[in-house]
């Protein structure tokens, strides 16, 4: 490992540039994957979301075991790097293996035939052969909003607020050292994985009414703030109304399950809102809404410490 204590400024900018490059590449990759999955039956779009939640669960487990087994942070970092390298190689292999898959080639062939037929029809009628992006956006907008709002609420709470909630009972079954790791990261990622798995079996409610439970999820924001949320270097003014660790655990579980479930369902509904030849474009719009929801949710989470430091409801 390199000692960067002698050049902190250069290290900072190298880190920032690396983060920008990595996240830009991740955004392009994620958008492309959702576009590819949108050409397949809806359950495959749900499988992409499920895979994202599975990676979160795997990371949370890795964090827990490295914290438990690694003697120091440097050793834990080596474990993380080696694991990430193997997973990256596996993903690289599957990327090149996908076109060999017979089912994917069959679905791609159907999509190409539909596109060729549309091109011939447009050529005969003199229409421009470009996707009607605005029309696709308007048709998908209800599900785009659902996707955005699910991730907005989730990322407004996880991990910034979620990880700063402290135990209210010193004798709780999970010790203070592992409290945030288990109650926040492991609980959320595992329950989100369960929610995504349920969505692959059952999609409810319908496209028209999905917005109702999605909007109701905004109530998780005050519920989490009412728990024993103690942001660092902030004097909390808002009273702690939920001081039972088991109640907090139930709230965290339902938040995680609903996040995984409704995000999967909304992403699965999105390509169904348009004609089959536009499903890939609709999937990419859905991925853009997902990323936008994540970004705005993270930005909004920065307001939470100020809320508990300046707002006192005065409820008895």
Language-model-detected regions and their locations in the chain:
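Membrane-interfacial loop- and helix-cap regions that link adjacent transmembrane helices
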Residues: 1-18, 97-98, 102-265, 269, ...
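Loop-to-transmembrane helix entry/capping segments in MFS-fold secondary transporters
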Residues: 13, 31-32, 36-52, 178, ...
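Glycine-rich segments within core transmembrane alpha-helices of 12-TM secondary carriers
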Residues: 22, 26, 41-91, 182-193, ...
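Cytoplasm-facing ends of alpha-helical transmembrane segments in multi-pass membrane proteins
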Residues: 23-40, 90-102, 261-271
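Membrane-helix interface/capping residues of multi-pass secondary transporters
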Residues: 42, 77, 206-209, 279
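Interfacial helix-cap and linker-helix signal at transmembrane-aqueous boundaries
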Residues: 66-72, 165-166, 202-203, 304-308
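A late C-terminal transmembrane helix in Major Facilitator Superfamily
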Residues: 244, 248-257, 266, 274-307
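Extracellular/lumenal N-termini and interhelical loops of multi-pass eukaryotic membrane proteins
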Residues: 311-316
